[in-house]
């Protein structure tokens, strides 16, 4: 856990007031960056950059972060995070499982965004890294390695700094921890010593993560040991509850609901569900595999109740349920956010606050009107029902639990990429 104790958690320290003075013989790497909105830049400064690729199951995203570093002799001042350039492409790398060179070309396309965003004079000292998540974890190892090799070749041809470990598959728990740190840092929840933090819920295409700081000893006692991660900061020990569930992301859950998760797609066979419009006949490609799917055309039921029964089988009894989540505050993002936007429950730009029961209410509304479905995603009923089941019957949230749905905080994307970039800069000795 040395990585978590040092590398990933420098942002926790960074959330202190700007005038903080560190009394240590050796400054650890996480003492070096502050968010510019918290610590305005009023002196001459140098600029540095970091490029982080998030290779998810449904798309590849690039984050270009800009930092400002005060002049070297101004030792009382520390670098600040100035902003982020974000872009993405679809589908994800896993869709190119048998065409690795073609998959790497999508990364090349996004590298042009970095070149346009960073002055040429900084290219040689700007590190570029790609971390893949659940989409590549689900692939056979040799297939995933072939994709990563081609991406590394693209990086080597770029004008940027390419570390030895520039391309890798990230552990799911690392994903959850860094997302928790990022959200709590950006929202200012880690200021001071009261440890009043928020939990985080991340719903990707192939996996989902839940992370929070337990407040009750009972939670620690009843939680499996591999769900807890400890680290130290300011002479205090933090113990996070965090777990990543591979195969429980939104897209993987569709396959599980259809009964297609363990298959490679069967020619001529159509997977059917009560969660889909009765007349629907369609094809869907996920992870480079084509699936035929449709509704219950004749005697089969459709609507919320039969649909919920289908998605319930995917999650019931398969996830750990800490009692404490019913009383906690949580930020939810990724597909939680996207589906709430798709159904006009929240504003795309501002996000919003929802209760778990709001997802169930919207699921009932959509599913019980499948016969009138005309546009949008045919999976909307299934997705909303799955989100409801995941929250209530999977994680054990109460219907009244309030969730903050957000995509950005202080104009910075939520998720793990910011923390990973901080770690990258320090590991290369760039952040000071």
From Swiss-Prot:
An MF annotation (GO) of this entry: UDP phosphatase activity
Annotated signal peptide: 1-24
Pfam families: GDA1_CD39
GO biological process: 'de novo' post-translational protein folding; protein N-linked glycosylation; UDP catabolic process; UDP-alpha-D-glucose metabolic process
InterPro entries per UniProt: GDA1_CD39_NTPase (IPR000407)
Highest taxon listed in the record's lineage: Eukaryota
EC number: 3.6.1.6
Class of this enzyme: hydrolase
Glycosylation (residues): 235, 372
Residues of the active site: 175
Pathway named in the protein's UniProt entry: Protein modification; protein glycosylation
UniProt keyword list: Calcium, Disulfide bond, Endoplasmic reticulum, Glycoprotein, Hydrolase, Magnesium, Secreted, Signal
Localization: Endoplasmic reticulum; Secreted
Post-translational modification: N-glycosylated; high-mannose type.
Subunit relationships: Monomer; active form. Homodimer; disulfide-linked. Homodimers are enzymatically inactive.
UniProt-recorded name of the protein: Ectonucleoside triphosphate diphosphohydrolase 5
Gene: ENTPD5
């Amino acid at each position: 856990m040395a990585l978590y104790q040092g590398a990933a958690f420098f942002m926790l320290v960074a959330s202190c007031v700007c005038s903080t003075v560190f009394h240590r013989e050796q400054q650890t790497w996480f003492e070096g960056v502050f968010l510019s909105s918290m610590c305005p830049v009023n002196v001459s400064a140098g600029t540095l950059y970091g490029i982080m690729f998030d290779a998810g199951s449904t798309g590849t995203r690039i984050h270009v972060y800009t930092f400002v570093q005060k002049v070297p002799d101004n030792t009382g001042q520390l670098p600040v995070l100035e902003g982020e350039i974000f872009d993405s492409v679809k589908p994800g790398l896993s869709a190119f499982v048998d065409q690795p060179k073609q998959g790497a070309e999508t990364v090349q396309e996004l590298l042009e965004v970095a070149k346009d965003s960073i002055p040429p004079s900084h290219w040689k000292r700007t590190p570029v890294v790609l971390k893949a998540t659940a989409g590549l974890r689900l692939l056979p190892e040799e297939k995933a390695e072939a994709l990563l090799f081609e991406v590394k070749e693209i990086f080597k041809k770029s004008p940027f700094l390419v570390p030895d470990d520039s391309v890798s598959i990230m552990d799911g728990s690392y994903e959850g921890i860094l997302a928790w740190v990022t959200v709590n840092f950006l929202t200012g929840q880690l200021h001071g010593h009261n440890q009043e933090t928020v939990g985080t819920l991340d719903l990707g295409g192939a996996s989902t993560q839940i992370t929070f700081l337990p407040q009750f000893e009972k939670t620690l006692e009843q939680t499996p040991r591999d769900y807890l991660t400890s680290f130290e900061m300011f002479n205090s020990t933090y113990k996070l509850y965090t777990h990543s569930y591979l195969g429980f992301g939104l897209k993987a859950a569709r396959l599980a609901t259809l009964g297609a998760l363990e298959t490679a797609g069967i020619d001529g066979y159509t997977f059917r569900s009560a969660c889909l419009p009765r007349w629907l006949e369609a094809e869907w490609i996920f992870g480079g595999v084509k699936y035929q799917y449709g509704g219950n055309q004749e005697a089969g039921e459709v609507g919320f109740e039969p649909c919920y029964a289908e998605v319930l089988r995917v999650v019931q009894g398969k996830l750990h349920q800490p009692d404490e989540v019913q009383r906690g505050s949580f930020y939810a993002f990724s597909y939680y956010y996207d589906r709430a936007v798709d159904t006009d429950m929240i504003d795309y730009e501002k996000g919003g606050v929802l209760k778990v029961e709001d997802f169930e209410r919207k699921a009932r509304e959509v599913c019980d009107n499948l016969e009138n479905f005309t546009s949008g995603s045919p999976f909307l009923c299934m997705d909303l029902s799955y989100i409801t089941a995941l929250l209530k019957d999977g994680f054990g949230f109460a219907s009244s639990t309030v969730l903050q749905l957000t995509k950005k905080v202080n104009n910075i994307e939520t998720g793990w990429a910011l923390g990973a970039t901080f770690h990258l800069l320090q590991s290369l000795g760039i952040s000071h």
